[in-house]
Amino acid sequence: MNLSVALSSGDGRSLDGDIVVKLIDVRPDGVQMHVRGDVRPLRYRKGFGSPVPAKDGKKLRVAFTMPDIDHYFLPGHRLMVQVQASWFPLIAFNPQTYLENQYAAAAADYLPVTVGIEAGGSFLSLPVLD
């Protein structure tokens, strides 16, 4: 999956964040079953060896490669894609402010940001087996 996202705070600070993508199997009666999910810390969008802050309001390309899973969607079921900025308590809160060590964040470092997803620059590619 590839997403085009932009973080904005309105105050020009260096930003950070997490993008969580979940694939959901939705039954015809509306019941949802989590199939697969993954998180991408935006600071590591260029590789885990080189953290990079996000610039306020600048669009970022974020690529997800989720591990394969053997799941069969029954007739009448739908695929739901959820994109969110937190998966707490499974993943620690991200302060949204770029810090060298986000686990040493002070209360004042936790500031709101707006996460925008550009539909035209985002796509989902799934393998389909017969």
Predicted regions mapped to residue ranges:
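Glycine/threonine-rich phosphate-binding loop and adjacent beta-strand/alpha-helix elements that clamp
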Residues: M1-D130
